[in-house]
Amino acid sequence: MTGVDNAYRDVVIDAHYDLLSDVFRLRKSGERKVIERFFLEDVKAAGVDVLVCSLFIPDVYLPEMGLRHALDQIGMLHCEMEESPGLFSFCRNAQEIKKTINNGQTALLLSLEGIEPIGNDLVLLRVFYELGVRFVGLAWSRRNYAADGCHFSTIREGTAGGLTAFGVQVVEEAERLGMILDVSHLNDAAFSDVLMFSKKPFIASHSNCRAISNTARNLTDDQIKSLAARGGVMGLNNMTNFVYESEEGTKNAKNSNLPMLPLAKIPEGKPRFEGFFNHIRHVIDLVGPDHIGFGFDLCEFKKPESERELSVFPTYKHTIPFIERIGREFPGIVAAKIRGTNWMRIIELLR
């Protein structure tokens, strides 16, 4: 047992949560104390201590409004903390997380889900670092100045690329600043480029195993081995199409921001989370238990019911039986690694 394992063995971490997208929508509609009133009870009930909250920019804000939308989300988080003092805290490193947890609060960290807010201005990456952002996803599932993202399903397109020259600069500057790179949503070429140009551990915050669910959003066995060899961690994503194999046809909610997704073949008569254990065991068989955690990607709380069907867990309270079963399926130290200490090892690297 390492020092991190021992110090944080009861900590539960979700490395990818689209909380601020919902906070933005609800505050724009006039709601206040959004996190406290709509989200925190479920998070606490599930025993989740640390949330990495993404700064995601919908297409409608691009290209001109990407920076402003990201800053709006950060500003609204600070408004939420003022309105709900003592319930949750914005953290930037392991020391702040430990203090927050010891005070009985939920710890929130920030991640860029795509570098659209900085455009092609590298100085803005430093600005986001100073604002407390500590994780950098180079791209969502689209092209930007840094890289090509992968698609959820096959589309007609021209030749895809990996990292651009600017993307290489982002990789180098992020690591210089002490930020952690996130390869979820990158295409295979961009993943290989990150492996080539980065020097430090990187993560895949919300990606599963492609050998089990064959989508470009998941990692191949070779990618998992490369990520593990670098000391990284991957987070289990709760989207059904990334947990299970898919069948013919597509499903999505009307007027959704999500792309059309293939229908997931979910086994009947078993919990919807059953498929997660295939991914966990596959990763452990490949690289051991030190490189898998949670990255649930819960973005369904205020979405239509038809869109919630795309998720294993509509809300955090639905994760409770799964998190509890982790402790029964795996030895104590392995269960602790999956629940949170693997992610804490990464967070300990933050400055």
Where is each model-derived feature located?
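Aromatic-lined glycan-binding groove of carbohydrate-active enzymes
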Residues: T220-P259
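Structural preference for beta-strand elements that scaffold enzyme active sites
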Residues: D10-D14, V50, A107-S111, R134-F135, ...
